[in-house]
């Protein structure tokens, strides 16, 4: 989101930038490849309390930042961890109605990450069991972001029609899930090297492969079939994300571009990944070209006002009939399952 945040202005820009930094902070803890999962869980659960309780934060934030010295990652991510107090200083200056949208989403993200870390087997590849678990994981790391953006947009658009609000509420989670599943699809090798497999074990088993056989590439044909099933589901979420975007007023060009840019790039990425064996052969990431990114950034502002032109443009990105036949997302089913996950009782002793 770093690129598209730049198109925003004013209070919304400040709030979304701050929330993005919070998400990067917890993501850095979750992604630390050398850090014991028990320590990750402790840091993540502690962060959720820091953002929920200002009084607790005043007394304990310095100690939390000190504990984060054990986290490994890129120099920029570790510097952000070190500057967590500055991010909270900016957060405290935001309007209360914006803070109220950020707190529950970031807290839920941290707790959800901790929950999945409690299942991590250090030193071996830990798979997700099925599509339902994949949806649950993606909700905590990205679906909550879609909900938060939706609620922040509502603060800026007090006169938005109830019809548009309902459309956005129904598709906000898919906005996040579509982008996250795109990342999962293109990062299979990198995630495997970190010890995680976000490709559900059930999908792999359906094709007659074990986890080890899938990751060894013993059958490229079956591996591509497995990837296609995930891309098909991803494309369904991206279609829902388009509905979310088109519900924004046509006059709110900046808000639309904020959604259009990552959505178009995700769809382009899915089209590149489609039937692409290079994804499963090399550690070098399969990604869209800089020229493609440039065309998206330069071309979409001219059509952002038109729902019809946006639909045509988006439809032209992925024209394969297999990927267009996506399963319907059971949002209510996901929400029902999420209610049964005991987030507040996750601890590092699990």
PLM regions with names:
Residues 67, 264-267, 308:
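Enriched - but not universal
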Residues 253-264:
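Amphipathic alpha-helical protein-interaction segments enriched in hydrophobic
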Residues 1-242, 246-249, 312-330, 336, ...:
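Acidic catalytic motifs of isoprenoid enzymes
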Residues 273-350:
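Acidic, carboxylate-rich catalytic segments that either coordinate divalent cations
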Residues 152, 182-188, 265-277:
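Extended, well-ordered alpha-helical segments in internal regulatory regions
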Residues 235, 239-246, 250, 267, ...:
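Hydrophobic alpha-helix feature that most strongly marks membrane-spanning transmembrane helices
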């Amino acid at each position: 989101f770093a690129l598209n945040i730049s198109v925003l202005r004013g209070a919304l820009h400040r709030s979304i930038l701050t929330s993005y930094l919070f998400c990067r902070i917890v993501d850095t803890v979750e992604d630390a490849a050398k850090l014991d999962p028990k320590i990750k869980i402790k840091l993540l659960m502690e962060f959720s309390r820091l953002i929920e309780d200002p009084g607790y934060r005043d007394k304990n934030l310095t100690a939390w930042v000190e504990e984060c010295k054990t986290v490994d990652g890129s120099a920029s991510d570790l510097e952000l961890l070190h500057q967590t107090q500055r991010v909270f200083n900016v957060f405290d200056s935001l309007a209360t109605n914006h803070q109220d949208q950020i707190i529950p989403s970031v807290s839920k993200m941290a707790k959800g990450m901790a929950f999945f870390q409690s299942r991590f087997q250090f030193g071996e590849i830990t798979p997700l069991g099925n599509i339902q678990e994949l949806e649950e994981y993606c909700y905590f790391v990205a679906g909550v972001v879609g909900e938060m953006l939706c609620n922040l947009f509502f603060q800026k658009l007090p006169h938005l029609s109830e019809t548009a609000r309902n459309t956005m509420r129904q598709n906000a989670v898919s906005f996040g899930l579509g982008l996250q599943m795109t990342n999962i699809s293109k990062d299979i090798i990198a995630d495997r090297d970190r010890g995680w497999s976000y490709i559900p074990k059930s999908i792999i088993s359906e094709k007659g492969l074990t986890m080890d056989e899938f990751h060894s590439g013993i059958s490229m044909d079956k591996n591509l079939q497995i990837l296609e099933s995930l891309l098909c589901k991803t494309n369904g979420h991206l279609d829902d994300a388009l509905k979310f975007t088109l519900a924004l007023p046509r006059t709110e060009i900046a808000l639309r571009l904020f959604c259009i840019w990552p959505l178009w790039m995700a769809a382009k990425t899915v089209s590149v990944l489609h039937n692409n064996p290079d994804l499963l052969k090399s550690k070098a990431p399969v990604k869209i070209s800089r020229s493609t990114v440039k065309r998206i950034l330069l071309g979409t502002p001219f059509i952002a006002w038109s729902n019809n032109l946006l639909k045509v443009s988006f439809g032209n990105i992925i024209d394969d009939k297999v990927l267009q036949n996506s399963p319907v997302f059971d949002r209510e089913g996901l929400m029902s399952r999420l209610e049964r996950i005991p987030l507040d009782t996750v601890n590092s002793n699990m």
